[in-house]
């Protein structure tokens, strides 16, 4: 997040690092990403760390409430550590958290947050929305092929295709008759945007349901998936490509990962829920590596799921009290572009 958390002091996070036996001598907030809060730290032995504090209220895919969110986040971080240590060589592209002295991959920070610590890896980070070159697309597909062939750790959860934020989206669609005044500067514009495109959004929800039924009827095998292997979670270190942010790891069909690579490749359609090219030419490399041909309907399902979930999350953000902050403006702009893209493809 660009903004620091309003309810957490830096001193609280620094104290939490004692569980990792880290004594920071250099400490700086890192205004990156969207959803979690990050700091960089250097300890007395000149080791560098990337410290992440998760807002458990924003981890709805793990279940309702902070306890379910913490349990799900812990399972995801445990899974990342297990993947990194997979025998015989491990998945060296997994940037996994560092366990505490007691073996914990994540620790509670107050009632509604959790902290994890990662090694600060040298490299060039990407950004969400970047276009992958054919070379990068190939390298990422190679990583995903390795990941999808890896045996699932015991901590890996099955992740159904449904999206947990759907009730918030449906609630917003039902509650458009009155102005959303007195909440924040972007609430009422969000309502007006939704009112214009409500029929199209309901149609896309119907399409989503149809594609979920098709996927379940196919009985496709589940594999370990990252969940968000987009350029923003990619670190370039020479010819190596590393994957960050494993909080969405879980068991699903491969297309949960593959659509993002296909859409992010040079010349492919955007990852905004619009129908169009499925990047079949890009995915040939994956098919050759795994022997499994990606299913176009499943690719379309997960593309649509991403967009609908984004709409729900941004609406939830803007229907809560907010000010004209950079993060709120980012949510407003992303909501507008995503809703318009969904409607255009309806």
Question: Locations of the language-model features?
Answer:
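Juxta-kinase regulatory segment immediately upstream of eukaryotic protein kinase catalytic domains
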Residues: 1-27
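A cross-family kinase active-site recognition segment
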Residues: 101, 130-196, 222
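A conserved alpha-helical element in kinase catalytic cores
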Residues: 53-113, 128-129, 134-139, 277
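Protein kinase glycine-rich loop
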Residues: 28-32
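ATP/Mg2+ or Mg2+-diphosphate-binding catalytic cores
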Residues: 268-275, 312-346
């Amino acid at each position: 997040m660009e903004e620091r958390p309003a309810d957490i002091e830096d001193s609280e996070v620094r104290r939490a690092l004692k569980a990792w036996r880290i004594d920071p001598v250099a400490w700086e907030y890192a205004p990156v990403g969207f959803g979690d809060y990050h700091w960089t730290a250097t300890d007395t032995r000149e080791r560098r760390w990337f410290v992440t504090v998760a807002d458990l209220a924003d981890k709805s895919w793990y279940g309702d409430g902070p306890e379910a969110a913490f349990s799900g986040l812990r399972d995801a971080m445990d899974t990342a550590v297990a993947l990194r240590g997979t025998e015989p060589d491990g998945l060296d592209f997994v940037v996994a958290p560092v366990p505490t002295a007691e073996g914990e991959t994540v620790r509670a920070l107050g009632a509604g947050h959790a902290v994890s610590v990662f090694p600060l890896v040298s490299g060039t980070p990407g950004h969400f929305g970047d276009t992958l070159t054919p070379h990068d697309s190939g390298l990422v597909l190679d990583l995903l092929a390795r990941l999808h062939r890896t045996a699932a750790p015991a901590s890996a959860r099955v992740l159904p295709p449904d999206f947990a934020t759907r009730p918030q989206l449906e609630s917003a669609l039902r509650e458009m008759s009155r102005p959303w005044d007195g909440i924040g500067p972007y609430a009422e514009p969000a309502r007006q945007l939704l009112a214009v495109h409500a029929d199209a959004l309901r149609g896309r929800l119907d399409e989503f349901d149809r594609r979920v039924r098709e996927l379940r009827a196919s009985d496709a095998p589940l594999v370990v998936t990252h969940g968000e292997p987009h350029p923003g979670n990619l670190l370039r270190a020479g010819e190596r490509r590393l994957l960050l942010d494993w909080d969405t790891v879980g068991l699903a069909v491969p297309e949960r990962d593959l659509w993002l690579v296909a859409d992010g490749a040079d010349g492919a359609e955007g990852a905004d829920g619009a129908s169009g090219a499925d990047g079949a030419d890009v995915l040939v490399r994956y098919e050759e590596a795994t022997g499994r041909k990606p299913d176009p309907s499943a690719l379309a399902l997960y593309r649509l799921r991403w967009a609908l979930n984004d709409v729900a999350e941004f609406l939830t953000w803007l229907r809560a009290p907010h000010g004209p902050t950079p993060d709120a403006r980012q949510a407003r702009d992303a909501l507008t572009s995503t809703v318009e893209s969904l409607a255009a493809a309806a």
